[in-house]
Structure formats: C-alpha cells, structure tokens
Amino acid sequence: TIPAKSLWDTGATGTCISYDLAQKLHLTPIGFQNIQTPSGSAQVKQYKVHIVLNQELVVKDVTVFDSEIGQQGLDVLIGMDIISLGDFAISNYDGTTQFSFRIPSQEHVDYKDVAN
C-alpha cells in the first residue's frame, strides 16, 4: 500500500492514476483504452488495482487508466465508477465543509422533504 493524494471527480467516468504511481507500484497493463478528457483524446494503459479509501474501505479489482494527473500534483483521480458504488455527501454545517462516503449505498439522501 502506498499513500496517494487523490481528488474525487464527479465529472470523471472512470478512475485514473498517475504515470508515476503506476511505475512505483510496478503495475503491468491489462490492456489499452481510448479515452476523452477535457484536454483531448488519448489511448491509455489500463490496470487492475485495489484502492483503499480513508485507510479502511477497500474497493477491489478496479480498472484504472494511467493519466497525466501527476502534473497537477495528484496520484489518483476517483471517478464515478467508484463513487456510484456508494453514498457520497458533502455538507457545510457551521461553516465547516465535510465530505462523507460509504459503500454499499444504504439509502437515498434528499433534503427537500426535511423540515427546517
């Protein structure tokens, strides 16, 4: 296990890892994939990995793509392939922003029916 700086991206379909992280982990590609990013299209390598979130939640056998995200100081970009496995929430109670994620999904969160 290697600690990694990650970004949760609801606009990303899939999860990506930096070229550097793929090398550090000595990953062997399982294939190639054509992808479309905000900066254009590319053919990238695919890998199978286990991702540990918050040192406790393990997401096994995730197909990830290598990416230039290392240029942004990131090791992992977590996309909707992982986010859609569970419940994802952001709150800003008392001026403090908090993020929460759990797998499996347990219920719909809908604040419109909550009395103020």
Regions flagged by a language model, labelled:
Residues 1-116:
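Pepsin/retropepsin-fold aspartyl endopeptidases
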